Amino acid sequence: MATINQLVRKPRSLKAAKSNVPALEACPQKRGVCTRVYTTTPKKPNSALRKVCRVRLTNGFEVTSYIGGEGHNLQEHSVILIRGGRVKDLPGVRYHTVRGALDCSGVKDRKQSRSKYGVKKPKA
């Protein structure tokens, strides 16, 4: 136990919080270029072919990003925007692709939850 005198000289230091999304470097989103677009299978007990892409970010990081929604137009060399947010059943996938930004199109024929999938309001 430290004495009062020791604490006056050198106060207790706070533990630095570890980021869940280190590649973003405290930014809300980052731009990057797809280096590989592929599908992968989730952990047990789930079963699917999840669409993901490997992205080289502007800050030099190379991360894996999940592509949400039904269908996408991404391929190698597509420029995309990524945001934080992990996919619980895909180990190592800690980022999401922002739909409707840069080269990534919005989800076709989407009527509900449109803002999450980059879809404009349909003409009434």
From Swiss-Prot:
One of its GO terms (cellular component) is small ribosomal subunit. The modification 3-methylthioaspartic acid is found at D89. The keyword Disulfide bond does not apply. Keywords: Methylation, Ribonucleoprotein, Ribosomal protein, RNA-binding, rRNA-binding, tRNA-binding. It comes from the Bacteria. Pfam families: Ribosom_S12_S23 (PF00164). InterPro entries: NA-bd_OB-fold, Ribosomal_uS12, Ribosomal_uS12_bac. One of its GO terms (molecular function) is tRNA binding. One of its GO terms (biological process) is translation. With S4 and S5 plays an important role in translational accuracy. Interacts with and stabilizes bases of the 16S rRNA that are involved in tRNA selection in the A site and with the mRNA backbone. Located at the interface of the 30S and 50S subunits, it traverses the body of the 30S subunit contacting proteins on the other side and probably holding the rRNA structure together. The combined cluster of proteins S8, S12 and S17 appears to hold together the shoulder and platform of the 30S subunit. Part of the 30S ribosomal subunit. Contacts proteins S8 and S17. May interact with IF1 in the 30S initiation complex. Belongs to the universal ribosomal protein uS12 family. This is Small ribosomal subunit protein uS12. It comes from Pectobacterium atrosepticum (strain SCRI 1043 / ATCC BAA-672).
